[in-house]
Amino acid sequence: MMTRLTWICHGSTAANREARFPLDEPLNEKAVIATQAIAPRLRHADNVFASPTLRTRQTADALGLQPAFSDALADCDFGRWAGRSIAEIQQLEPENLAAWMARPEEAPHGGEAIAAVCTRVNAWLSQRLQAGGHIVAITHAAVIRAAIISTLNAPVASFWIADIEPLAIVHMTSNGSRWSLRVEGATA
């Protein structure tokens, strides 16, 4: 049985614009409008899941979707870095930031290691391998990156290679035994 999975990164927040590690913050006004514009493309889902954060709940609302919330789709826990800018962390904790970026099994901020995010997301993907139908998952850039590297069987160290923007849409399909990335083209 074929399963289609559509990943949607939440809309833009102040943290996105200001290059900060996010808190549980709302979408900005422009993000709500942009999200509503893509809603017609996502109305035909058999199952909808979302991270329980405010920004993903607001994205789901703007899309007109009613998700089941899953902690497995939550953003990385950035520990004491939450709410702080990357520039600030670079200035105050350059060694810790470098370690976190280079060694995915480390969490010098006291939160969650990138490797732990990848393990969590891989388990969620595995549970839906044979689900069938169309699944929509509204989540965060870190979760979508983890899903991509899991699908490609890439090492966790490649986590930073994918750049996921707000409202990015990533498609995957499963034939029941493995996930594949799916790139859509324009239809004639």
Predicted segments, located by residue:
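Loop-to-helix element that buttresses phosphate recognition and phosphoryl-transfer chemistry
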Residues: 3-59, 109-121
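Generic beta-sheet signal
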Residues: 5, 133-142
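Short active-site segment of divalent metal-dependent hydrolases/proteases
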Residues: 13, 143-144
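Phosphate-coordination/substrate-recognition cap region in phosphate-metabolizing enzymes
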Residues: 36-95
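Glycine-rich phosphate-binding loop signature in dinucleotide/nucleotide-binding domains
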Residues: 42-44, 128-133
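A polyampholytic, Gly/Pro-enriched intrinsically disordered region
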Residues: 87-101, 178-188
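Short glycine/proline- and acidic residue-enriched helix-loop micro-motifs
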Residues: 96-116
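Domain-level recognition of soluble alpha/beta enzyme cores
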Residues: 155-180
